[in-house]
Amino acid sequence: MTHSLRVIFAGTPEFAAAALAAIHEAGFPVPLVLTQPDRPAGRGMKLQASAVKRYALEHGITVAQPPSLRRAGKHPAEAAAALDLLHATPHDVMVVAAYGLLLPQEVLDLPRYGCINIHASLLPRWRGAAPIHRAIEAGDAETGVTLMQMDAGLDTGAMLHDARVAIAPDDTTATLHDKLAAAGATLIVDALVELERAGALAATPQPDDGITYAEKIGKHEAALDWRKPATVLARQVRAFDPFPGGAGTLDGVTLKLWAADAMPARGDAAPGTIVDAGADGVVIACGEGALRVTQLQKPGGKRLPAREFLAGAPLAVGQRFSPPDTAA
């Protein structure tokens, strides 16, 4: 089936690529895709295209990669060229998903139907850069995807559609990301079909109650504070997979801790102390309860199940992980 609604798409990572693919495969014309410039990545730090760019090029869609869209920003010439391209590209609506660049009012005002953002939370909870991570870290039972009519604020626009997604007890950011990407892809296609048919989408202002902000994840957050309850640390480990991972420093060596679950305390060992180390996992005393780590990684190594890790790097009962403020 083909559609007449013309969609400019702006996005960068896999979450956005899933939406672009759904829009394209549903038959909506996509005359232009905006995505971030190629970035160095991997061990060789070679320039790599974004997931959105890869999809667009594979399907013959024109791609633009301005470093900024702000005429008065650090890249005025590139921004002006991109804005000229937007003005010259006939379109009806812009769909934005994890683009990573600020859209100035000039861009928001350009499409006939404005700009629709696909946000990976149930707004107004978890506005901001890392909604998936923060939902798991906070112990939320569910999250979801919200389609929002973009305005000048940070995820403050009126809500158009949403879809709820349960957070499973073993969900990591990686697994939940994929569920939300699929939900967002379905949601945006349904909304575009409705927009094309009806000429408008019902918009509901975000409530003032329940607003929270999902701050960007920093590498420093990987360090586990063993004084916290094990339930909190288990959520942190799941929330920070695949980035930045959980981390603990043992005898001056920082280990990545990739999978863990909370369990009752064993004895009265000080927080950070290993109280058991076997095939079922490495059990570490916490401020409340204990954390059983079942997947570990040493510097330069691979993620390994506890059994395999211990075969090559034995850990002993009584060893103690350093508190994060003294690990350096």
Curated annotation (Swiss-Prot):
EC numbers for this chain: 2.1.2.9
GO-annotated molecular function: methionyl-tRNA formyltransferase activity
Family to which the UniProt record says this protein belongs: Belongs to the Fmt family.
CDD domains, sorted: FMT_core_Met-tRNA-FMT_N, Met_tRNA_FMT_C
UniProt-recorded name of the protein: Methionyl-tRNA formyltransferase
InterPro entries, per the entry: Fmt, Formyl_trans_C, Formyl_trans_C_sf, Formyl_transf_N, Formyl_transf_N_sf, Formyl_transferase-like_C_sf, GART_AS, Met-tRNA-FMT_C
Classification via HAMAP family: Formyl_trans
Stated role: Attaches a formyl group to the free amino group of methionyl-tRNA(fMet). The formyl group appears to play a dual role in the initiator identity of N-formylmethionyl-tRNA by promoting its recognition by IF2 and preventing the misappropriation of this tRNA by the elongation apparatus.
Binding positions ((6S)-5,6,7,8-tetrahydrofolate): 121-124
Signal sequence bounds: none
Catalytic activity: L-methionyl-tRNA(fMet) + (6R)-10-formyltetrahydrofolate = N-formyl-L-methionyl-tRNA(fMet) + (6S)-5,6,7,8-tetrahydrofolate + H(+)
Enzyme category, top tier: transferase
Provenance organism: Burkholderia thailandensis (strain ATCC 700388 / DSM 13276 / CCUG 48851 / CIP 106301 / E264)
